[in-house]
Amino acid sequence: MLSPKKTKYRKFHRGRLKGHATKGSALAFGRYGIQALTSSWITSRQIESVRRVIVRHLKRGGKLWIRIFPDKAVTAKPLETRMGSGKGSPEHWIAVVKSGHILFEIDGVSLELAKEAVKLAIYKLPIKCKFLSNDEFAKD
């Protein structure tokens, strides 16, 4: 699973999910992609699950780019612990995704195979997503 090697701070504020993505909202590497339609947190486990589904479906045929990285730690207190006594310890890593952000990109496969792989991958994500294709290449 993905996680940063080193961070400036151990614990982060939760923050708010406002607005749409301005950067990372266009295809940059591949012909096809998965675009988020809603904003949410995506865990490193969910990213790994989607990666495995896509790679297995492409069967060594294409290339996959992961455009998001879980760089924010989410803390949690142990079960049955009284309130107070500080913030909990880092539990897992998340990527903050805003609507319009490209999550994954695929290249080197046909349009049909890419659509099938993306359809399977979207089931693994906790947000609404859509299939995106670069129009200049999608006329095969």
From Swiss-Prot:
InterPro entries for the chain: Ribosomal_uL16, Ribosomal_uL16_bact-type, Ribosomal_uL16_CS, Ribosomal_uL16_dom, Ribosomal_uL16_sf
GO terms, biological process: mitochondrial translation
Pfam families: Ribosomal_L16
Predominant place of localization: plastid
Annotated compartments: Plastid, Chloroplast
Keywords: Chloroplast, Plastid, Ribonucleoprotein, Ribosomal protein
Cellular compartments per GO CC: chloroplast; mitochondrial large ribosomal subunit
Coiled-coil regions listed in the entry: none
Record carries keyword Ribonucleoprotein: yes
Gene3D superfamilies: Ribosomal protein L10e/L16
Record-level Gene Ontology MF annotations: rRNA binding; structural constituent of ribosome
HAMAP family cross-referenced by the UniProt entry: Ribosomal_uL16
Similarity comment: Belongs to the universal ribosomal protein uL16 family.
Subunit field text: Part of the 50S ribosomal subunit.
UniProt protein name: Large ribosomal subunit protein uL16c
Organism: Cyanidium caldarium (Red alga)
